[in-house]
Design a protein with these regions (language model features):
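Catalytic active-site module of serine/aspartate enzymes centered on a nucleophile-bearing elbow/loop
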Residues: 2-7
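An N-terminal hydrophobic leader/cap segment in hydrolases
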Residues: 8-66
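A short loop-to-beta-strand scaffold at the N-terminal edge of the catalytic core in hydrolase folds
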Residues: 61-79
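Glycine-rich adenosyl-nucleotide cofactor-binding module
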Residues: 81-85, 107
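Active-site glycine-rich loops that stabilize anionic/oxyanionic intermediates
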Residues: 82-83, 91-94
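Structural cue for short, hydrophobic secondary-structure segments
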Residues: 88-91, 115
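Conserved alpha/beta-hydrolase
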Residues: 96, 103-125
Length: 128
C-alpha cells in the first residue's frame, strides 16, 4: 500500500530570539510585552524575491511615486501594455510581483496590470 504524498503547508516558525525576548519581557512587564508584540505585528516581514516572480520583476516598468497624504514613497509596477488596466494589490508582508500568475493570465486576456509595493513592503522604503 502506497501512501499519497501530502501537500506541505507553509508555516512560518517564530524565531527563538523573539520567543525568548517575549518570555523575558512577560516575566518583568506585561506593558513592555504588549509594546513588543505590537511592534512585531505592525512590522512587515521582507521576503526574498522568489524565482517565479523574476520575469515580472524584469519585464515590468517600475517607478517610484510619492504619496503626499501619507508622506511615503512606493514602487509601482506596470506589466504589459493595454488600454484595459487592472490594479493588483498584495497583502501584508507581500509585494507587487507576488501576484505574477494572475498578472500573466490577465496579460493573455489583453490587460495591463498595475501593482505596487506598499510602504515598508517589497522595494518600497520604510518601516512601520
Amino acid at each position: 500500500m502506497s501512501k499519497k504524498k501530502q501537500k506541505q503547508s507553509q508555516v512560518i516558525e517564530i524565531p527563538k530570539p523573539i520567543l525568548y525576548t517575549a518570555n523575558f519581557l512577560q516575566a518583568i512587564s506585561s506593558s513592555l510585552t504588549t509594546k513588543f508584540a505590537a511592534k512585531l505585528f505592525t512590522t512587515p516581514i521582507r521576503h526574498k524575491l522568489p524565482k517565479r516572480e523574476l520575469h515580472m520583476e524584469r519585464e515590468s516598468v517600475q517607478k517610484s511615486i510619492m504619496i503626499p497624504e501619507i508622506n511615503k514613497e512606493i514602487v509601482v509596477y506596470e506589466y504589459g501594455k493595454s488600454d484595459k488596466k487592472v490594479l493588483l494589490v498584495h497583502g501584508w508582508s507581500g509585494r507587487g510581483t507576488q501576484l505574477v500568475k494572475i498578472a500573466d493570465e490577465l496579460l493573455k486576456m489583453g490587460y495591463m496590470t498595475i501593482s505596487f509595493d506598499a510602504p515598508a513592503h517589497g522595494k518600497s522604503k520604510g518601516n512601520y
